[in-house]
Amino acid sequence: GSSDMKWDQNYALTSDEKGNAYLYGNFVTNSRVDVKYGEAPLATHKFSQATVNAKSYALDATVVSLTDEGITYDQIVEDVKKELDAGKTYINIILAPDVDEETLEAIHIGLLEGEAKDWSINLTLIGCKKIPSRGFLHFDMLKSIVLPDVTEIGENAFSDCPGLQKVVLGNLTKVYGKGRENGIFDGCETRFIDLVLSKDQKVMNDGEAEGRYCWTADIITDYDLSNEHVSKKFLGYEFKSITCRYKFE
């Protein structure tokens, strides 16, 4: 049974309780369908040939939920490994808002035990608002990371992820750490990273909070079209491109 059906004059989209989306309709060659959570892409399907009448196309937008209070470290490792065993390189996970280091470590171990190749995994983590310090340290397998709900990030969060090519973040209010002194992207080649920020992102001002170096969102000034945006700079780093309403590259 479908939990949600959207009608258009050309197609119908239904979904089941496991997060699979089924598409019925007429699409021309090379047309594309994206399944998204807010701005975060969960699945993309490109039609290499025109669609066949009365045939449905399954779009795998499966999301793994790791929010159960009783979930163990080993269960998380196994759940992540299962995704890799199924041949997936796009992995979508729902987490609790205040995800802890242990959960992220279990995800890391699952990716390692599942033999994820370096620079191959596109990881989307839905629901988590705070990323702890060193949360994704040495996640060598990451090609992209999407954190649509995140508002606060701890020091060295993405340090030493040499293969990162794309980072999508939520509307940030606080980011800890100074570039080249435990900044969140230390050990990454940010000039090769496409950064996507929330359209509501404010300019980040550096200072201190609780004795730690901290970037705090400005109350008034929008980031989009700011001097930093135009010069592709954010949190003291320079990026390949920065998208915030508009893309500068």
Segments (PLM) and residue ranges:
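Short, acidic Ser/Thr/Gly-rich low-complexity loop/linker segments typical of extracellular
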Residues: 3-20
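Short Pro-Gly-centered beta-turn/loop motif in secreted/extracellular proteins
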Residues: 20-32
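Extracellular beta-sheet/turn segments enriched in Thr/Pro/Gly and aliphatic residues
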Residues: 47-65
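The feature captures the LRR N-terminal capping module
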Residues: 64-87, 101-105
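LRR N-terminal entry segment and analogous cap-like coil->beta motifs
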Residues: 85-149
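Core hydrophobic positions of leucine-rich repeats
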Residues: 106-113, 131-142, 153-163, 175-190, ...
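Conserved LRR concave beta-strand detector
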Residues: 122, 144, 152-155, 166, ...
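Feature marks extracellular polysaccharide-active and adherence modules
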Residues: 124-126, 148, 159-160, 170, ...
